[in-house]
Each structure stands twice: as C-alpha cells, then as structure tokens.
Amino acid sequence: AAVARAEGVELWSDAHFEALRRTMKILADAGQKVITATLNKDPWNHQCYDAYEDMIRWTLAADGTWHYDYTIFDRWVELMLSLGIDGMINCYSMVPWNNELVYNDEASGSPVTVKAEPGTPEFERMWTPFLKDFKQHLAAKGWLEKTNIAMDERSPEAMDAAVKVLEKCAPEMGFALADNHSSYKRYTMMR
C-alpha cells in the first residue's frame, strides 16, 4: 500500500506491480530470499502509516461455502520469484495482532470483520476451510514445500492454538515466526 500511495497509483494495478518490481529489485540485489505475503487484511493491526492490504480475498458464498481469490497473492509471488527471491514464502498471519479476519459476505454484498481468537471455535471455523483450500492451491502452483504460515511475536498460547489447527489441516506446510518468547524451541515444523 505504501508503494501505491507514494507512486500515486491504484492498489494492485499494473502500475502498482511495476512500481513494486522496481522496489523489490533492490531487495533482490541485496540478497533477499524470503517472500512476505498476507493471508488476510492487515495482520500487523495498522502499525505502519499504510495498512497492509489483503493479498487473498475471502468470500462467504450465499450457500455457506468459502471461496478464496488468490489472484493478487499469485501475482505477488510470481513477481518475487521472477526477481530471484525464491527461498521461502512466509504468509502472515493466522494470528494477526488484532485477531480480526475480514471477508466479503456474498449474501449481503458487504465486508464482515470477525474476531477469531486462537483456541476458540470461531478461530477453527474460519481457518480450517481456508488452510485446506490454500494447501491445494499451493500444491497446484508448486509452492507448497516452500510456504510457511508465519506469526509475529504472538504468545505461546496463541501460537499453540494456531499450530494445532495448522497441523490438522495442512501438516505439509511449514511454520515461521518472529519470536519474543523463545517459542521456537517448541515447534518441530519450523523452517
């Protein structure tokens, strides 16, 4: 979002992706190897001037099924891979700082914000269908083995709850974190 604002272009437009290419080329030339992507809107709860926008659009269909639009995510990952940033894809976050998830409700045509605290039925209800679908999408793209669900300085209790759902729904995926609790010692699927 910051690049779009600074360049005066529409978010996720062709012009935005071209501006991102120029900016990310600097990172690639400096040796960057990890792609950072968002699973939902603003996983860091607007800690920056520009909130992080969602790269995957979640929609609850009128019939109660979930649909996920990976168009922006795919384009972002493909851009980064084309620059040689290809070590891992770290996706933030199953435990966003505000524990909120945003989706489009097809029946009402409106966005909905849900509070999904780790360890609650709502958390599992929201993340189970997504992780199963995301895993299939990543496998089809050939990215499953390099993709991690990433968390940023979350409590051990919150991470335990998230890891439990991740291991149940997508055990093939890795796990990455910025850790301020020495939690890294607890997880075998760390990459």
Tell where the protein language model's regions lie, with residue ranges:
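Aromatic-lined carbohydrate-binding surfaces of glycoside hydrolases
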Residues: A1-M173, D179-K185
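Structural recognition of alpha->loop->beta junctions
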Residues: R186-R191
